């Protein structure tokens, strides 16, 4: 499953909190995505104080921003969250003249359908969510060349799932031969039913 993370400028007016100082940058990001030493270096070189908060899922981030109460300058959601944030009026346009390094970003990651012309977001990085396993602790017949292997009875209470609704439903869709971008209700129900069958093998999320 491919995921892209993007910086977005959050509309502070959506928050009931103070707009803060021009010498303070409030960032809302995934946990463990920026080294604290890098933040210290940024503050030392710029004189700008960074208030850094973290979240563990796009849904948690979106809920907190929607509810207000905290004012953020920058948030780092995955690509599929951008469109919802735009529709809810949670973002403000980015002035590209203030981002000279934009020219150094691979064009394959720019001007994508969820944000044409990158009006509201700038790519941060991208990666994949995969399957990691210890071959010494599983049955020899399991190769994980097929999603079906995860449903093998020998894996009862041995699987840890990532805490991400899109990643999990995407796995369910892939397991029935469908794209994770499917919107058809019948296929989504089929994928959900298949995930329910996987539950005996899940130890934790």
Locations of regions flagged by a protein language model:
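Extracytoplasmic ligand-binding site segments that recognize negatively charged/polar headgroups
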Residues: 71, 76-205
């Amino acid at each position: 499953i491919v995921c892209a993370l993007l910086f977005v400028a959050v509309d502070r007016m959506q928050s009931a909190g103070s707009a803060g100082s021009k010498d303070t940058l409030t960032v809302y990001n995934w946990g463990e995505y920026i080294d604290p030493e890098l933040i210290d270096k940024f503050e030392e070189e710029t004189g700008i104080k960074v208030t850094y908060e973290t979240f563990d899922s796009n849904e948690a981030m979106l809920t907190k921003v929607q509810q207000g109460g905290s004012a953020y300058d920058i948030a780092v959601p995955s690509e599929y969250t951008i469109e919802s944030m735009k529709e809810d009026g949670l973002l403000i346009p980015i002035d590209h003249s203030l981002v000279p390094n934009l020219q150094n970003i691979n064009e394959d990651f720019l001007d994508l359908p969820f944000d044409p012309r990158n009006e509201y977001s700038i790519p941060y990085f991208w990666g994949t969510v995969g399957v990691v396993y210890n071959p010494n602790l599983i049955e020899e017949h399991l190769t994980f060349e097929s999603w079906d292997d995860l449903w093998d009875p020998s894996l009862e209470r041995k699987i840890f799932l990532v805490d991400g609704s899109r990643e999990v439903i995407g796995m369910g869709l892939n397991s029935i031969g469908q794209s994770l971008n499917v919107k058809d209700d019948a296929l989504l129900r089929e994928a959900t039913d298949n995930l329910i069958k996987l539950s005996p093998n899940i130890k934790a999320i």
